[in-house]
Curated annotation (Swiss-Prot):
Family membership: Belongs to the SPEC3 family.
Glycoprotein as UniProt keyword: yes
Underlying gene: SPEC3
Membrane topology: Multi-pass membrane protein
Protein name: Protein SPEC3
Organism whose genome encodes this protein: Strongylocentrotus purpuratus
Glycan-modified residues: 71
């Protein structure tokens, strides 16, 4: 039978199982100052005395931001053409009551009719009435010229018939000849000018 050691007796016997031998770290490779991970060394933490890792040493490059490149695209368009301005000039003559009775002749014809009325009362008035068809009242229609001729023909006859009555016809014919010279300004004038300007801002009408 095996003997049982008494309680409290010192046990100086070696342990039944020896401890496992510890493995030594592998030797460091040249060019790497830090030991490799996975051999009993904790991984280094950034921000605690360790420099940040450099690009190109086992770290992928950062992704490029394609949205920034798309947002920087500049589109240049041609400016819209300015609206064209159109200017229309209209010259027209407006009839008046004096023009219907007193024809508008050239200044030379008006002076000639005045001379006839001075020396031959009423004759210059009749000549001015018939001359309206060839060289008087520019721009007037045919009916207006016929009316002017009839008025001056009958006025010329009245001037001839009243010249013996206190020289009334003679004075009347001189005043009528002076009116021929006054109406000659209407013959030389271009009439009323109307300027119509159209553009992007609307239509502008100017009457001169």
């Amino acid at each position: 039978m095996a003997q049982v050691a008494p309680t409290g007796a010192p046990t100086d016997a070696p342990p039944a199982y020896p401890p496992p031998p510890q493995q030594a770290p592998p030797p460091q490779q040249p060019g790497y100052g830090q030991p490799q991970l996975g051999y009993g060394q904790p991984p280094p933490q950034l921000g605690y005395g360790q420099p940040p890792p450099q690009l190109g040493y086992g770290y992928p490059p950062p992704p490029q931001n394609n949205n920034m490149m798309m947002n920087n695209t500049v589109v240049v368009t041609a400016p819209a053409p300015a609206p064209a301005n159109n200017v229309v000039i209209i010259n027209q003559k407006k009839d008046n009551c004096c023009r219907q009775a007193i024809p508008a002749h050239h200044i030379a014809a008006a002076i000639l009719c005045l001379i006839f009325n001075i020396f031959f009362p009423g004759i210059g008035t009749i000549i001015a009435g018939f001359a309206v068809f060839c060289c008087g009242n520019p721009g007037a229609d045919g009916g207006s010229k016929v009316g002017t001729m009839c008025i001056n023909f009958w006025i010329g006859l009245l001037q001839i018939g009243t010249v013996w009555f206190f020289f009334l016809g003679w004075i009347w014919s001189i005043m009528w000849g002076a009116a021929f010279i006054g109406m000659s300004a209407d013959y030389h004038s271009g009439g009323d000018t109307t300027i119509v300007a159209t553009g992007g801002g609307g239509t502008t009408v100017i009457n001169n």
